[in-house]
């Protein structure tokens, strides 16, 4: 004989679990200044290479991520493309990013690299392509930007953006071309909220993305303010940080190879921090926590 109470309880638990999974998959979006839109949270693919990378990226798509962030220097554009091909998610519903390395800032080299990126991933277009670092001492980033604008006109790229750019670098691009980036991906976490760049980006309708959004090493997870908020909202410290970033109009790009962490990082849109709580995390800023100064650091 069926135990009706047990049956009802099991159905209730399963429905609650299903509801939670579906909630994670209901992605929210920011509007870009070029008319396109971008998911409010992305999936970082740094160091996700080969078959392991394909598996992790494919799992991320299954779990509800719709923004995949890669780069030429990550050497995994092929893995990203393979994961997309293996996935049941329609290509048009996935926002795919890659980045131009510093060694290819000159016009012809940059154009060839964009085409090579598309070939490596077996894609017809990128939703977003970024200049990875400005490399101001080399001073070819304007040339690279002009290529990006042309590639957008050719249909190879939907949105053009930059990464690790300071306001003065962006001002130079705009002054010379009249085109503002749609996105600026920068180092950002509770110990470095990058106030100057964030405010500039907001004023110019540029969406800020965060690499290393959880601060490598996890030291921020031990902060009293973050622990108390995690307890209050019944969330993990990582979820508090990621939600904080979306509330300051930042798209975090966390990386997670495990199924559990992938799901957990997405489960952040069912609560909201108060303005005072948002400010309490901004107040954790410390100058020494910044890893790279784009005016000095260069990558090729």
Where do the protein language model's features map onto the residues?
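Acidic (Asp/Glu)-rich catalytic clusters
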Residues: 33, 81-91, 115-122, 174-177, ...
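A structural motif
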Residues: 65, 123-126, 157, 181
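A short, structured active-site edge motif that brings together acidic residues
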Residues: 91-104, 128-134, 188
């Amino acid at each position: 004989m069926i135990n009706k109470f047990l049956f009802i309880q099991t159905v209730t638990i399963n429905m609650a679990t299903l509801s939670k999974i579906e909630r994670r998959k209901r992605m929210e979006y920011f509007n870009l200044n070029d008319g396109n839109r971008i998911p409010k949270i992305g999936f970082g693919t740094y160091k996700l290479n080969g078959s392991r990378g394909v598996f992790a990226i494919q799992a991320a798509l299954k779990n509800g991520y719709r923004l995949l962030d890669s780069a030429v220097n990550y050497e995994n554009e092929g893995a990203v493309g393979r994961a997309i091909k293996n996935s049941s998610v329609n290509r048009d519903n996935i926002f795919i990013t890659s980045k131009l390395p510093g060694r290819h800032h000159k016009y012809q080299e940059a154009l060839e690299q964009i085409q090579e990126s598309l070939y490596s991933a077996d894609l017809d277009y990128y939703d977003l392509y970024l200049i990875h670092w400005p490399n101001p001492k080399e001073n070819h980033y304007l040339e690279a930007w002009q290529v990006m604008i042309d590639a957008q006109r050719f249909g190879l790229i939907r949105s053009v953006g930059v990464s690790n750019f300071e306001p003065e670098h962006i001002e130079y691009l705009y002054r010379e071309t009249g085109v503002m980036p749609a996105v600026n991906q920068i180092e950002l976490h509770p110990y470095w909220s990058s106030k100057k760049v964030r405010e500039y980006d907001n004023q110019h309708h540029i969406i800020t993305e965060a690499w290393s959004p959880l601060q490598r090493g996890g030291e921020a997870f031990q902060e009293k303010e973050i622990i108390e908020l995690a307890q209050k909202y019944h969330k993990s410290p990582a979820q508090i940080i990621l939600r904080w970033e979306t509330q300051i109009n930042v798209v975090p790009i966390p990386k997670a190879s495990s199924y559990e962490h992938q799901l957990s990082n997405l489960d952040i849109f069912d609560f909201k921090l108060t303005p005072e709580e948002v400010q309490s995390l901004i107040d954790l800023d410390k100058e020494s926590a910044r890893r790279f100064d784009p005016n000095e650091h260069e990558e090729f």
